Amino acid sequence: MEHKIVHVGDIPVANDKPFTLFAGMNVLESRDLAMQICEHYVKVTDKLGIPYVFKASFDKANRSSVHSYRGPGLEEGMKIFQELKETFGVKIITDVHTEAQAQPVADVVDVIQLPAFLARQTDLVEAMAKTGAVINVKKPQFMSPGQVGNIVEKFAECGNDKVILCERGSCHGYDNLVVDMLGFGVMKQASNGSPIIFDVTHSLQMRDPSGAASGGRREQTVELAKAGLATGIAGLFIEAHPNPDKARCDGPSALPLDKLEPFLAQMKALDDLIKSFAHIDIR
């Protein structure tokens, strides 16, 4: 199978290339915190030689509770992203939730993300495709790996073949997610070799049935990330925070920021090893 390359600026993202890190914070909590977190990521990834794209949301439109923090909104969010790009020279990925957001966001960031809950919404797909931006599709928790080909085809029919696919776990009963490691290979086949990245952070979510926000299992970040990279994929998607217990969204799944460098050092070593192996074709 041929591995498709999607370029994020000068970064080639593909399943047979060194892994790209799509990472940052869950939601923009403040300009200063975004600057702090982005600076740390840039410092660590530069040191380790890992291609990097900063991630944050400007509007968490899918929060469980109407009382939960959503973010600074479109206008302020784009100002923060622009400052991050100018200050650190970093690429940026963020999610959009409506057709009207697609072009204004694509005018600022490098990758626009289709949220898992909205992955079948054709009008949103069309609006995102028309921007010409690189697209990151979060595979829905309710969708089998083989069905992602339909989403890739939908974008292609709308004129955009610059699609990255993101695994983020599948529903396993109520309030739990599991990751099927066989699914990475199925997604590659179903999408004709599209780049696959692995959202480790959100795959670690575990909801409290009586709560208004997701719980998580961040203590298992390392083992899950290692398992995903061992399948030979294009990248990892993670979120970190200086104080995860105080994060305004998904703190229980977030990596403590001071663990970022040792975590990424191990991930790079594993990825380099896996991609040094010759492919064994078994039919």
Swiss-Prot record:
<dbReference type="GO" id="GO:0008676">
    <property type="term" value="F:3-deoxy-8-phosphooctulonate synthase activity"/>
</dbReference>
<dbReference type="InterPro" id="IPR013785">
    <property type="entry name" value="Aldolase_TIM"/>
</dbReference>
<protein>
    <recommendedName>
        <fullName>2-dehydro-3-deoxyphosphooctonate aldolase</fullName>
        <ecNumber>2.5.1.55</ecNumber>
    </recommendedName>
</protein>
<comment type="pathway">
    <text>Bacterial outer membrane biogenesis; lipopolysaccharide biosynthesis.</text>
</comment>
<dbReference type="InterPro" id="IPR006269">
    <property type="entry name" value="KDO8P_synthase"/>
</dbReference>
<comment type="similarity">
    <text>Belongs to the KdsA family.</text>
</comment>
<dbReference type="GO" id="GO:0019294">
    <property type="term" value="P:keto-3-deoxy-D-manno-octulosonic acid biosynthetic process"/>
</dbReference>
<dbReference type="Pfam" id="PF00793">
    <property type="entry name" value="DAHP_synth_1"/>
</dbReference>
<comment type="pathway">
    <text>Carbohydrate biosynthesis; 3-deoxy-D-manno-octulosonate biosynthesis; 3-deoxy-D-manno-octulosonate from D-ribulose 5-phosphate: step 2/3.</text>
</comment>
<keyword id="KW-0448">Lipopolysaccharide biosynthesis</keyword>
<keyword id="KW-0808">Transferase</keyword>
<dbReference type="GO" id="GO:0005737">
    <property type="term" value="C:cytoplasm"/>
</dbReference>
<keyword id="KW-0963">Cytoplasm</keyword>
<dbReference type="InterPro" id="IPR006218">
    <property type="entry name" value="DAHP1/KDSA"/>
</dbReference>
